[in-house]
A protein has these predicted regions:
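Catalytic cores of TIM-barrel enzymes
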Residues: 1-140
Length: 140
């Protein structure tokens, strides 16, 4: 989001009345690919198409606060993959993560992931690093 949008968001969180009333939406992979005219799989596997889809959203709706901004995650698979979850992908379907544990009593067996090495986390971090200059150039 832009610096102005960030300041607006903080003001709202602080309980201030902001005029005009701001509008915000979650920007994420369930709607961006189809809205941008690309497959869901292309959105996840092409950094260029990912960036262009997010850029199209912020340029089409410049007054909307999009959270978290440029959505870099791979559906709802990023975090589970870091804990060892197998993920399944379809061309125009949302990816899904398979169970790692089958009982809450097993939660202590999970190993804390390393974002630089585990699952899809390195891809998310690297995508944002690779596009940081372009995102900033777009004012975000």
């Amino acid at each position: 989001m832009t610096d102005k949008q960030w300041a607006t968001l903080l003001s709202v969180i602080d309980g201030n009345i902001v005029k005009p009333m701001p509008a915000g939406f979650i920007i994420d992979s369930p709607w961006l690919p189809g809205w941008s005219g690309i497959t869901t799989l292309d959105y996840y596997t092409s950094d260029t198409k990912w960036f262009d889809a997010n850029l199209k959203a912020i340029e089409t709706f410049p007054d909307i606060i999009f959270l978290p901004g440029f959505w870099a995650e791979f559906g709802m698979c990023t975090e589970p993959s870091a804990f060892g979850s197998r993920c399944s992908w379809g061309e125009n379907e949302f990816p899904f993560a398979h169970k790692v544990i089958t009982d809450i009593a097993q939660v202590d067996s999970l190993v804390k992931p390393d974002p630089s090495k585990d699952g899809l986390l390195p891809f998310v971090v690297n995508r944002l690093k690779n596009y940081e200059a372009d995102i900033k150039k777009a004012g975000h």
